[in-house]
Amino acid sequence: MLARMSDWTPPELPVSAGAILLDEQGRLLILKPTYKSGWTVPGGVMEADGESPWDACRREVLEETGLEVDEGRLVVVDTRPGKDGAKLGLRLLFHCGTVTARAARRIRLQEEEISEHRFAPVDEALELLRKPVRRRVAAGLEAEHATYLENGRPAPGIR
C-alpha cells in the first residue's frame, strides 16, 4: 500500500505524474495507450483523495505495468496551457531508474488502458512519444536537477 499525505489537498488544477524508466541497456520504457494516439511513458492523473504526485507516479506505474517503483527523483515540472476552456495543467516527471531484466519479464499491462509496451533506444523512443511528452522526457533525461518548463519549453528567466 502506498503512503498517503493526510493533510495534502490537491490543487484546483489537474496534476499528473509520469515516470522515466530505463532497462539495463539504457532503453526507455514506452507504452501505447488504448484511449489516445501515439506512445507515452507510464503515468497519469493524481487522485483527489489526498494522493501526492510521487504516490500518483508510483500508483500509475504499478497499475499500468505491474512494476513497483521504490525510488525516483523529480526531474521536470511542466505547465500545460488549457485549451477550449480547460484548466491549466501541471505535469511532473520522475526519473525512477533502471528496470532489471528480471523485472522487465514480469511486466503485466493494464489491458483496458495499455495495448503494448516496449523498451526502445532513447532516440527512437523520443520520436515515437507524443510531442508534449517527448519534450518533457528529453528534458528529464538531461536534467541534473529538477527542470521547470512551460508547455514543454524552458520558461524565460528560469535556469
Where are these regions (language model features)?
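Short, solvent-exposed loop/turn elements at beta->coil junctions and helix N-caps
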Residues: 7, 75-83
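Acidic, metal-coordinating catalytic segment for phosphate/diphosphate chemistry
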Residues: 1-18
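Conserved Nudix-box catalytic region and its N-terminal flanking loop in Nudix hydrolases
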Residues: 23-63
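Nudix hydrolase/Nudix homology domain
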Residues: 37-39, 111-159
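Class I (Rossmann-like) S-adenosyl-L-methionine-dependent methyltransferase catalytic domain
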Residues: 5, 81, 147-151
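Conserved beta-strand and immediately adjacent loop positions that scaffold enzyme active sites
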Residues: 18, 27, 116
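Unchanged
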Residues: 46-70, 80-132
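Conserved positions in beta-strands of structured domains
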Residues: 20-22, 75
